[in-house]
A protein has these predicted regions:
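Core, highly hydrophobic multi-pass alpha-helical transmembrane subunits of bioenergetic inner membranes
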Residues: 1-261
Length: 261
């Protein structure tokens, strides 16, 4: 419904915010259970529920914006502002990870023998999988920019082609990151080094998963002709988010892989 004394669309009662909040809390608790009891079934269930809730929430937003036309100029500006604030909040989250890592590496504790990395930890070669992952993400940043360029020029086939390439590159990045974790000879519980590394790279990996889902949904919307060269705010926000992920990875690579090695 719309009030005539203001330009903003008043949302109907939606169950998705409270369900997402409860599910996010359960997801964090289940991750703690994984660290202590090595049991991940509850975590996988929470992850699947999070994906389902996100899809249903996206469905309602798409219906309100594309089919009902309730997202006017003011609402689109508010959505962009919300995305900027969200990215800033995520930036400060990663700053805390970098701060923690640099603090402990520049002044190692006596508990780990005043060494960084601690003894008996063989770290990854930064010129192997980490460098390949860096090239993959930089390439994906280039392909998503090309996709946006072709969208602005109303060349939908080329735009969808480069968007597909970006999605494939993101999935390949996640595969290589999983492979790297399997090859590691240290775990999350191996001193402050292991927890710092897995917290930072793990959270980045989770953001890559979210960004990939975001891109896949925009790919489906592009196929269904939801976007035009003038109106594609969802696609534009996913590009912002993807560039943010790429920039964070560059700092992760330079700090956690290159400088640390």
């Amino acid at each position: 419904m719309m009030k005539f004394n203001q330009p903003y669309y008043i949302l109907n009662i939606s169950p998705w915010p409270i369900l997402m909040a409860f599910n996010s809390f359960n997801f964090m608790i289940s991750n703690i259970m994984i660290m202590n009891f090595k049991f991940n079934m509850i975590s996988m269930m929470n992850l699947m529920l999070m994906i389902i809730i996100s899809i249903l929430w996206w469905r309602d937003i798409i219906r309100e914006s594309t089919f009902q036309g309730n997202h006017n100029f003011y609402i689109m500006n508010l959505i962009k502002l919300s995305m900027i604030l969200f990215i800033i909040s995520e930036l400060f989250l990663f700053i805390s990870f970098f701060w923690n890592f640099l603090h402990n590496s520049l002044a190692p504790s006596i508990d780990i023998g005043l060494n960084w990395p601690p003894k008996n930890i063989n770290f990854f070669n930064p010129l192997m999988i980490p460098l390949l992952n860096t090239i993959i993400l930089l390439t994906s940043s280039f392909t998503i920019t090309l996709s946006h360029f072709y969208t602005l020029n109303n060349l939908k086939k080329k735009s969808s082609m480069f968007l597909n390439m970006t999605i494939i590159l993101s999935i390949y990045f996640l595969y290589l990151q999983t492979l790297e974790y399997k090859q590691a000879n240290f775990t999350f519980s191996d001193s402050i080094f292991g927890s710092s590394f897995y917290m930072a790279t793990g959270f980045h990996g989770m953001h890559v998963i979210i960004g990939t889902i975001f891109l896949i949904i925009n790919m489906m919307r592009m196929i269904n002709m939801h976007f035009s060269f003038m109106h594609h705010i969802s696609f534009e926000l996913s590009i912002w988010y993807w560039h943010f992920i790429d920039i964070i990875w560059l700092f992760l690579y330079m700090t956690f892989y290159w400088w640390n090695n």
